[in-house]
């Protein structure tokens, strides 16, 4: 019953997380587009009110005319819409989802079976520390360098280095799947913290000053704008990190930290293309095609790097998954292995979760035909990733895994 309820919690939280993330990313991307597409107002009355940019748009059969004030409007309306619950709801639902999956099952997801020194409680603390420590370091960088000359460039370079170091460390401490997801959660935490600690408080100070008839300090808008820009460049890397959990050949590579960094870099470059494209369409900037070209080139390079190779090369490069300590290589001597040798292993260790009564992940392994249909998944989970049997992967010896490997590499036959 506990497993059933956890599955429902996982489903509902994942659904909620996707819904709120769509709302947050959508509003964030819209305002980046809006800021990049504003043109000086033509109406003299708007200029006198302090408007420094406007946009005319048509959507859904209606015409829209948003304007942006240089600092603040002369007076505030009775109702002012705020954009923050999209961010808070996304982070809260994401952290809840992280808790019921990775933290609740820390032994299975956060602790590598070859690392006897990492206790599940230690892994949980380390995972949470990644979220907090990165925010503190990132925030410190922004505080120290953000308002200096060329501060944006300095902050960008330092944060890029910090993300690279975090990726390397995460892939050393945690299994690749957890490392990739934690990197996404780490950046998403910084994004939401930017909203909570800087963007919204700064806006509240501006509103309070206007209500009290006091002059508005433009630094609040400048800081909020800087953090908002950071958020837009974090977005695509975060989305990649979350989606990567479905593709084991990414996070199980021997140099998975570098794979992660390169894919995040590609995402940031592609996002830069779209950000600058709005200014190009207005004649303000040169065509940003170099950023798109750079992002696509990195993607093609990673694609070529991770291309499938011979089975022997795969087994040599993938079992360790670049985590510490490295897993022992699976010995493959012993010739071909038939289904008759494989079946007892499946019956003893796999059918309990993948049989007639229960089919985890929709996989059933209690017949030769089903086993053959899922041969590639069996090979990946048992030999390459060494994650199965789930929750107790150490129950299978290297000899058992070598048997599965020989069976798969000699054709995955199930005929007697």
What are these regions (language model features)?
Residues 5, 65-83, 217-221:
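Cytosolic juxtamembrane amphipathic/interface segments immediately preceding
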Residues 28-72:
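Membrane-interface amphipathic/juxtamembrane segments adjacent to transmembrane helices
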Residues 87-107, 166-181, 234-253:
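Alpha-helical transmembrane segments and their membrane-interface junctions
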Residues 103-220:
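Long, contiguous internal "core" modules enriched in hydrophobic/ aromatic residues
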Residues 132-140, 198, 266-276, 300-307:
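Alpha-helical transmembrane segments
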Residues 148-157, 252-256, 280-296:
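Membrane-interfacial entry segments at the cytosolic side of transmembrane helices
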């Amino acid at each position: 019953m506990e497993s059933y309820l956890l599955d429902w919690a996982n489903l509902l939280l994942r659904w909620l997380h996707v819904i709120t993330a769509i709302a947050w990313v959508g509003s964030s991307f819209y305002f980046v587009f809006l800021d990049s597409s504003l043109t000086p107002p033509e109406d003299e009355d708007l200029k006198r009110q302090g408007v420094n940019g406007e946009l005319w748009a048509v959507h859904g059969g209606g015409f829209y005319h948003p304007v942006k004030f240089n600092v603040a409007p002369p007076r505030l309306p009775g109702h002012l819409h705020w954009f923050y619950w999209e961010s808070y709801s996304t982070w809260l639902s994401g952290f809840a989802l992280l808790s019921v999956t990775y933290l609740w099952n820390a032994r299975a997801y956060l602790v590598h079976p070859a690392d006897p020194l990492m206790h599940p409680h230690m892994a949980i603390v380390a995972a949470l520390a990644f979220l907090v420590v990165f925010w503190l370091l990132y925030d410190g960088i922004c505080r120290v360098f953000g308002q200096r000359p060329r501060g944006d460039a300095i902050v960008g370079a330092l944060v890029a280095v910090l993300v690279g170091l975090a990726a390397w460390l995460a892939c050393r401490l945690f299994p690749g799947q957890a490392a990739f997801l934690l990197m996404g959660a780490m950046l998403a935490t910084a994004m939401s913290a930017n909203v909570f600690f800087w963007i919204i408080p700064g806006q509240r100070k501006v509103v309070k000053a206007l209500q009290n008839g006091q002059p508005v300090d433009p630094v609040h808008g400048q800081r909020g704008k800087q953090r908002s820009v950071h958020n837009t460049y974090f977005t695509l890397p975060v989305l990649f990190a979350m989606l990567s959990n479905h593709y084991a050949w990414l996070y199980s590579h021997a140099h998975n930290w570098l794979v992660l960094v390169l894919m995040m870099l590609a995402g940031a470059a592609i996002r830069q293309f779209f950000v600058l494209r709005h200014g190009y369409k207005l004649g303000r900037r040169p065509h940003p095609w170099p950023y798109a070209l750079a992002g696509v080139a990195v993607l093609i390079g990673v694609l070529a790097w991770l291309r499938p190779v011979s089975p022997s090369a795969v087994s040599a490069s993938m079992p360790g998954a670049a985590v510490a300590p490295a897993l022992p290589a699976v010995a493959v001597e012993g010739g071909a292995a038939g289904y008759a040798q494989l079946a007892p292993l499946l019956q003893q260790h796999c059918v309990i979760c993948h049989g007639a009564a229960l089919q985890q992940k929709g996989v059933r392994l209690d017949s030769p035909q089903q086993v053959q249909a899922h041969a590639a998944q069996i090979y990946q989970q048992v030999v390459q990733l060494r994650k199965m049997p789930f929750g107790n992967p150490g129950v299978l010896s290297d000899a058992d895994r070598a048997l599965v490997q020989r069976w798969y590499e000699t054709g995955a036959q199930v005929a007697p």
